Amino acid sequence: MLHKMREQVAPYGKKLAMTEGHFAIPGRNRCEVLSTWAAGVAYARILNVQERNGDILDIATLADFFGNRWQVNAIIIPTPIRNNKPYLQPVGWVMMLYRRHVGEEAVSVSYPSDLDVVASRTGNRIFLHVVNTRMDRPIKVNLQVDGMKIVRGKVYEIAEDPEFEITELTPDAFRPREKELTGEEWVFPSASVTAMELECVAEIKD
């Protein structure tokens, strides 16, 4: 779809805005499947597509802002409220994770076929958005940055059972877990979405 949009806007030199970007499930239902972590993983892959096209896509969203019934919202307001507070849907958690950990400039990246990865940078800090598309196994990688050495890093990870559904009773189920990266190897859990910040220094060649 985006490649067609590129062709359409090319003569005008304009950038695009994307709204109402959420999934829509056919039939008379509230799209309950969108409360599962499987939907969160799928949405992360769409966000990666948006990032890869950031040169023409100026602003985008993958959800309606908030609501109390339909699951296409980023925030659900329980109704009746009682003692429960509004909570983020999987798409909301993923959008927040990506927005908080992203660089100013896109950089190219290569990765195994079962991962979906985009990369960006701000100075010597490299940011990775990584989706493990496999629901059945983790994937181990060796991280390398051309011309630079990774000194340390922080990892923000969401990894849950793809069939798990978030509700007002488990509002923080998809809260990212922060971990330290001390080497160049990392294992991405099955069905996970991860944001990484890598502190790097330029390699000095003899």
Language model feature labels by segment:
Residues 23-28, 66-72, 135-138, 162-166, ...:
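Flexible loop/turn segments at secondary-structure boundaries
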Residues 114-149, 155, 191-197:
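Carbohydrate-binding surface patches
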Residues 16-127:
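Aromatic/acidic polysaccharide-binding cleft in carbohydrate-active enzymes
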Residues 31, 36-39, 75-76, 132, ...:
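Composition- and surface-driven signal marking solvent-exposed, interaction-prone regions
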Residues 12-14:
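A short helix->loop->beta-strand "cap" motif at the edges of active sites that frequently abuts
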